[in-house]
């Protein structure tokens, strides 16, 4: 018993190829050129997708996540307790920290007994997913709506942001405290 194997296409995209001779017009490729011109003309009248940055700024999504910032409380103390949940939740493993015990003369700097002596985010690894913000029980880290994610630079060391670049400036913390008290 002989079985014949037919050329069956599983995807449905298989086409039969013909080797027929081209006509004179087809050999001049006029039909293909006209089709290409029609596509070009169609795109010419569409709405432009490019903008003239920085004169025009594209509107960001309401769920946009920008630059990282470590929050301070109303008294200017850092919220971070170096629990490490942000580092554990980071899928890119971009966050590293070293915990330290607060000394008696540092009560005005840190809220809890334990604080992050070293807190670094490697911006070359960060994917701005926001999981660190969600994992933090003290609401110490958040992603701002700043449109400048990471300033350009040529040296890798400048992309590892330490507490000097991440901690919220004192004047902004005081403004936030005044806004909370006003509400």
Swiss-Prot record:
PROSITE patterns: 4FE4S_FER_1, 4FE4S_FER_2. [4Fe-4S] cluster 1 binds at residues 80, 83, 86, 136. Its EC number is 7.1.1.-. GO terms for biological process: aerobic respiration. GO terms for molecular function: 4 iron, 4 sulfur cluster binding; iron ion binding; NADH:ubiquinone reductase (non-electrogenic) activity; quinone binding. It catalyses: a quinone + NADH + 5 H(+)(in) = a quinol + NAD(+) + 4 H(+)(out). One of its GO terms (cellular component) is plasma membrane. Its cofactor is [4Fe-4S] cluster. The keyword Ubl conjugation does not apply. InterPro entries: 4Fe4S_Fe-S-bd, 4Fe4S_Fe_S_CS, NADH_quinone_OxRdtase_chainI. [4Fe-4S] cluster 2 binds at residues 90, 126, 129, 132. It is an enzyme of class 7 (translocase). It is found in: Cell inner membrane. It comes from the Bacteria. Coiled coil: none annotated. Keywords: 4Fe-4S, Cell inner membrane, Cell membrane, Iron, Iron-sulfur, Membrane, Metal-binding, NAD, Quinone, Repeat, Translocase, Ubiquinone. Residues 71-100, 117-146 form the 4Fe-4S ferredoxin-type domain. The keyword Nucleotide-binding does not apply. Belongs to the complex I 23 kDa subunit family. NDH-1 shuttles electrons from NADH, via FMN and iron-sulfur (Fe-S) centers, to quinones in the respiratory chain. The immediate electron acceptor for the enzyme in this species is believed to be ubiquinone. Couples the redox reaction to proton translocation (for every two electrons transferred, four hydrogen ions are translocated across the cytoplasmic membrane), and thus conserves the redox energy in a proton gradient. This is NADH-quinone oxidoreductase subunit I. It comes from Flavobacterium psychrophilum (strain ATCC 49511 / DSM 21280 / CIP 103535 / JIP02/86).
């Amino acid at each position: 018993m002989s079985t014949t194997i037919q050329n069956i296409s599983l995807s449905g995209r298989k086409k039969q190829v013909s080797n027929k001779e081209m006509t004179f017009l087809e050999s001049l490729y006029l039909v293909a050129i006209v089709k290409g011109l029609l596509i070009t003309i169609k795109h010419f009248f569409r709405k432009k997708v490019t903008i003239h940055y920085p004169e025009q700024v594209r509107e960001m999504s309401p769920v946009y996540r920008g630059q990282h910032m470590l929050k301070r409380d109303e008294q200017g103390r850092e919220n971070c307790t170096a629990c490490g949940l942000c580092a554990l939740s980071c899928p890119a493993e971009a966050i590293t920290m070293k915990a330290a015990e607060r000394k008696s003369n540092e009560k005005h700097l840190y809220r809890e007994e334990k604080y992050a002596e070293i807190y670094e985010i490697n911006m070359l690894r960060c994917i701005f997913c926001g999981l660190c913000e969600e994992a933090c029980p003290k609401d110490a880290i958040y992603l701002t709506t700043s449109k400048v994610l990471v300033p350009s630079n040529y040296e890798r060391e400048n992309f590892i942001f330490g507490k000097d670049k991440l901690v919220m400036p004192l004047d902004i913390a005081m403004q936030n405290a005044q806004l909370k008290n006003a509400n």
